[in-house]
């Protein structure tokens, strides 16, 4: 007979793979930033970094090194990379703003860690405080793509909608919700359940406005070429009645051929 713990481990392993995909989903955007030298600010990486930082705290407090810890450790390593890259390459006013945001996150994280470790003396209360913060930041992470939904509705275009992120967020939230239902954990159930709802809304909007999105024109489309063909036809002397100076003239006939 299959035990609930074995089922939970199997679901957790699959959830690991999907969570890796969630943290890797900004990679195509990051590659475009490097390729096109785009300095536009991206909010998602900062939120992912903060979310990963706070999800490390319950594992440290509970001394748990397992399925969840593997995912969050990977996210903590990967998430800040695009943000730090943009800070290094960004030379406009957004650079200073991003530096302030990251510094504020680091200070807030340090304050929470010191406050919990020094001010709270039981593991149960520490887990409760940090768990609440995890719920808040996980919810922010899942809801962050909703910031472009108003633009999608206004323009009736899904051009700037992060489809890959929405799909992976939906699968990630669905799996981790299933994971916690086998053995209930409210701190994982609430944010991931909301994540399923938020991602479903994003996918529904994508289906609705996909057909109304203007199609991009092919930049490699070849236009018709115009080839002038000149024919020189000499004409004898023109009578003085037609030319007051008595000079000779020539008529040039130009044929234009359009080749598709």
From Swiss-Prot:
A Pfam family the protein falls into: MtN3_slv
Species: Oryza sativa subsp. japonica (Rice)
InterPro entries noted in UniProt: SWEET, SWEET_rpt
Cytoplasmic topological domain residue ranges: 31-40, 85-99, 149-161, 207-260
GO molecular function, one term: sugar transmembrane transporter activity
The organism's taxonomic lineage, starting at the top: Eukaryota, Viridiplantae, Streptophyta, Embryophyta, Tracheophyta
UniProt-annotated location(s): Cell membrane
Quaternary structure and partners: Forms homooligomers and/or heterooligomers.
Name of the protein in question: Bidirectional sugar transporter SWEET7a
């Amino acid at each position: 007979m299959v035990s609930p713990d074995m089922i939970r481990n199997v679901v957790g392993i699959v959830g690991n793979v999907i969570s890796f995909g969630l943290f890797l989903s900004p990679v195509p955007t990051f590659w475009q930033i490097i390729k096109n030298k785009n300095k536009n600010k991206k909010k998602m990486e900062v939120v992912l970094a903060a979310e990963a930082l706070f999800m490390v705290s319950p594992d440290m407090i509970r001394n748990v090194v397992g399925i969840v810890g593997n995912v969050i450790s990977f996210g903590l390593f990967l998430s800040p990379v695009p943000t730090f890259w943009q800070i290094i390459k960004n030379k406009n006013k957004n650079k200073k703003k991003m530096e302030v945001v990251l510094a504020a996150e680091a200070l807030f994280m340090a304050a929470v860690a010191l406050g919990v470790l020094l001010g709270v003396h039981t593991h149960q209360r520490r887990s409760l405080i940090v768990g609440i913060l995890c719920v808040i930041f996980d919810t922010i992470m899942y809801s962050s793509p909703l910031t472009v939904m108003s633009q999608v509705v206004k323009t009736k275009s899904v051009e700037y909608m992060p489809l890959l992120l929405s799909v992976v967020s939906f699968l990630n939230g669905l799996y981790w919700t299933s994971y916690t239902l086998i053995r209930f954990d409210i701190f994982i159930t609430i944010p991931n359940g909301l994540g399923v709802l938020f991602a479903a809304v994003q996918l529904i909007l994508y289906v609705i406005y996909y057909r109304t999105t203007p199609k991009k024109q092919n930049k490699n489309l070849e236009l018709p070429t115009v080839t002038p063909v000149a024919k020189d036809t000499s004409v004898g002397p023109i009578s003085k009645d037609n030319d007051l100076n008595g000079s000779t003239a020539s008529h040039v006939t130009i044929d234009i051929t359009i080749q598709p």
